[in-house]
Amino acid sequence: KGYKFSFDKDMIKTHGPGTKNKYVTIKQAIGDLPSLKTGEEAFEYKQPPFSKYQKEMRKDAPKLTCHKAPNHPENTIKKIKETKPGDPLYNKFKQRIRLSWDDLSPTQVSGGIRPQFQLAHPEDVRGLTIRERCRIQSFPDNFVISGGFVQARVQTGNAVPPLLAEAIALGIKKDNKGVYV
């Protein structure tokens, strides 16, 4: 009754020390995107990509889209300024952090009253743009998100990252000896 499931525990470690795949840091994911102030928007890349991941994300995307900084009230700007990269913005809400260039991203969530600052930019005093959220999730720059900021945040927060979906699909294909289920 029910299903029996087992897996090779070594299969879990696919990235990082001791593997052939390196982690993608925040800097490697979004460090080439133009710096913005609250409410600003950019449509052009200002520098070339400097990581393999950035090159892959930019493929087939001649223009930059969805790179508009959220507007913030003064108290939010003050809170972000006071927070060191890698630290939580609030003691009560540990999932709202200011990202650090050298770290990995925590899970993005879709809900919340103030969606613009679940994750604050490591250097700029603002929340992430939709393009930055997409990049971190492995959506290429030619991927179009529709709707306003909140709707786009819900889409990125609820999404399965494309590179994760690909890895799962390849694992299923490999485990089933190429037979699709």
Predicted region positions:
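Hydrophobic, well-ordered secondary-structure elements that form the walls
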Residues: 108, 129, 136, 157, ...
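Active-site and glycan-interaction determinants of carbohydrate-active enzymes
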Residues: 143-147
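Class I S-adenosyl-L-methionine
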Residues: 1-89
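Generic C-terminus detector
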Residues: 148-181
